[in-house]
C-alpha cells in the first residue's frame, strides 16, 4: 500500500455526496465488528433515517489524489479490488454539526449478524446439535446458505433440549458457540457481502499468502509507504494446573461424570512454575463421560491458548481476526505464526492507516471464553401437561416423566412434542415405591430449574386454576380429601366434635 489511502463508504441504494474525514474500526473473534465513519457533505439535509439497515461497504484503497471521497453505489469507487473492506448494514446515523460550508455526519457500519442483537426471543430447540440450532436461527432471519458456513473437525452431540429464554438471538448464538468451543469470524465477498465463518480447529484458520510481514520495531513514520509491524510485545501468563468437572445425570444415576485435565509437564519441568491451582466446574450438564471429557478439554484449551499473548501495532492492511501471519523475524513462541484475535483500526485525511492488534501462537487451538451469561430462572414458571392424541389416561414414560407446554413457547409442535420428558418432584420416593398421582392433560404445573438453568426443568408443584378448580371449596375447610381423576375418594373430617 502507498503512503496515502483513500477511504470510501458506498451504499447499495443511495449515492450521497460525501467526503470521508476519518474512521475507526473495532473487530474481534466471536463478536460483530463496528466501523465508525465521520464524513462531510455540502448537503445538510441527507435523509439519515432512510439509510438505517441499508446495505453498505467501507473500503480502504491506495490513493493517488488528495481527497477521500464517498463515490456512490457499490463498485463505483474503482474497478480494482479494495485493499481492505468491511460490508454490512448501517446501524446508526448522526448529524454531528452544521456550518456554512459543510455538514459533518457519522455512520456506523456493522455486519448483518449484528442486527440479531435487537431480536429477543424465548423458544425451545429439541434434538439438534449446536451447528443445527445456529443454522436455524440464521434461516429464521432470512440468511441464505451463502451468508454463513460451518467448518467442522468433529461431530457434535445432539442436545435433547435447549432453551432460549429472554435472550437476544445474537447472545444466544454466541453462548452456544462458547459452550462448544466454536469460533467465528467474517469474510468479505464481492458477491455475497459479509459472510460468517464458523470453525473449531487450527486447520480452519484463515491463511493469507500475503501475510508474511515485515517487522520494523520503532519504525514509526519512516515506514510510511511500507506495510510493516511497528511493535510486537509478548506477554506470558500463568495457567491453571488443570480443569476438573463433575455432574450428575439422573437417567444413568450410577454413571461417574467426573473428568479432569492435567497441564503438568514432568516433575522437573520449569514450565510447572507457571501453574496456579486447579479450576473446578459443576453443572456443565454433560450426559455421558465422553461429553464430560469434551467439555473439560474445551475449558482447558481456552486457558492454554491464552498463555502467550502478543500485542502489537502496524499498518498491514490485510490483517484481520482469525488470520495467521508470519513475520520476517522469527519468534520461538509462535513457530507456526501468529493468529490474530482482535484489532483496532484508524485512519483519516491527515493520517495514514494504522492498527493495533492482539494475537496468540497459531499452533494452538483457539477457544472462545465463556463470557455470554446464561439465562437464569430463579423462581418458577407455569406450564401445562400435554399428551399424545387420543390419550385417555395420563401420558407418562417409563421413568414417570411428563411432557409440558411452556407459556413462552409460541412454536407449533406435534402433540406431546412440546418439551423433553420432565420429572415430577414427589413427597416420597424410592426404588419402585413412593407417592405418584398421575397428572392428566391440561393440568397446570409449576416448573423449577436445576441451578436456575432453563435447560434443566422439573415439576416442583401442581396447581388448580380457574379451568381446573380446587376440589375443596370454602365451606369444606375442615375436610381432607384425596379424589382421583376417576372419582375415587378418601375423605377425612377434622370437625372437633367428630374427632377423638
Listing of model-derived features with the role each one plays in the protein:
Residues 1-500:
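Amphipathic alpha-helical and helix-coil boundary elements used as assembly
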Amino acid at each position: 500500500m502507498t503512503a496515502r489511502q483513500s477511504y470510501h463508504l458506498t451504499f447499495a441504494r443511495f449515492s450521497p455526496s460525501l467526503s470521508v474525514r476519518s474512521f475507526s474500526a473495532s473487530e474481534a473473534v466471536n463478536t460483530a465488528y463496528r466501523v465508525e465513519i465521520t464524513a462531510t457533505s455540502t448537503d445538510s439535509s441527507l435523509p439519515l433515517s432512510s439509510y438505517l439497515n441499508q446495505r453498505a461497504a467501507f473500503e480502504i484503497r491506495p490513493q493517488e489524489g488528495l481527497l477521500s471521497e464517498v463515490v456512490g453505489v457499490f463498485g463505483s469507487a474503482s474497478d480494482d479490488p479494495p485493499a481492505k473492506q468491511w460490508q454490512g448494514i448501517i446501524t446508526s446515523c448522526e448529524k454531528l454539526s452544521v456550518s456554512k460550508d459543510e455538514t459533518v455526519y457519522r455512520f456506523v457500519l456493522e455486519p448483518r449478524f449484528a442486527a440479531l442483537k435487537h431480536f429477543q426471543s424465548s423458544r425451545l430447540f429439541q434434538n439438534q446439535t449446536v451447528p443445527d440450532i445456529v443454522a436455524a436461527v440464521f434461516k429464521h432471519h432470512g440468511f441464505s446458505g451463502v451468508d454463513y458456513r460451518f467448518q467442522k473437525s468433529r461431530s457434535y452431540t445432539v442436545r435433547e433440549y435447549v432453551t432460549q429464554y429472554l435472550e437476544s438471538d445474537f447472545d444466544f448464538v454466541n453462548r452456544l458457540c462458547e459452550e462448544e468451543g466454536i469460533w467465528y469470524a467474517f469474510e468479505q465477498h464481492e458477491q455475497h457481502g459479509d459472510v460468517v465463518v464458523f470453525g473449531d480447529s487450527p486447520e480452519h484458520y484463515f491463511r493469507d499468502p500475503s501475510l508474511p510481514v515485515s517487522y520494523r520495531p520503532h519504525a514509526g513514520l519512516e515506514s510510511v509507504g511500507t506495510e510493516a509491524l511497528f511493535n510486537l510485545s509478548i506477554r506470558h501468563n500463568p495457567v491453571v494446573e488443570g480443569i476438573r468437572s463433575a455432574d450428575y445425570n439422573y437417567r444413568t444415576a450410577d454413571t461417574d461424570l467426573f473428568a479432569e485435565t492435567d497441564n503438568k509437564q514432568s516433575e522437573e519441568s520449569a514450565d510447572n512454575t507457571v501453574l496456579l491451582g486447579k479450576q473446578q466446574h459443576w453443572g456443565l450438564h454433560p450426559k455421558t463421560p465422553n461429553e464430560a471429557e469434551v467439555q473439560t478439554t474445551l475449558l482447558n484449551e481456552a486457558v492454554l491458548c491464552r498463555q502467550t499473548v502478543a500485542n502489537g501495532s502496524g499498518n498491514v492492511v490485510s490483517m484481520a481476526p482469525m488470520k495467521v501471519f508470519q513475520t520476517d523475524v522469527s519468534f520461538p513462541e509462535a513457530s507456526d505464526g501468529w493468529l490474530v484475535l482482535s484489532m483496532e483500526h484508524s485512519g483519516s485525511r491527515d493520517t495514514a492507516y494504522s492498527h493495533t492488534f492482539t494475537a496468540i501462537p497459531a499452533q494452538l487451538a483457539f477457544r472462545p471464553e465463556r463470557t455470554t451469561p446464561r439465562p437464569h430462572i430463579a423462581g418458577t414458571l407455569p406450564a401445562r401437561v400435554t399428551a399424545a392424541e387420543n390419550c385417555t389416561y395420563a401420558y407418562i414414560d417409563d421413568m414417570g416423566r411428563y411432557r409440558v407446554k411452556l407459556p413462552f413457547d409460541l412454536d407449533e409442535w406435534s402433540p406431546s412434542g412440546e418439551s423433553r420428558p420432565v420429572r415430577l418432584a414427589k413427597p416420597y420416593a424410592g426404588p419402585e415405591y413412593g407417592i405418584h398421582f398421575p397428572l392428566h392433560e391440561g393440568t397446570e404445573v409449576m416448573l423449577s430449574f436445576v441451578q436456575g438453568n432453563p435447560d434443566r426443568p422439573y415439576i416442583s408443584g401442581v396447581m388448580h386454576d380457574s379451568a381446573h378448580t380446587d376440589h375443596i371449596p370454602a365451606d369444606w375447610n375442615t375436610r381432607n380429601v384425596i379424589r382421583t381423576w376417576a372419582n375415587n375418594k378418601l375423605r377425612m373430617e377434622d370437625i372437633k366434635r367428630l374427632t377423638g
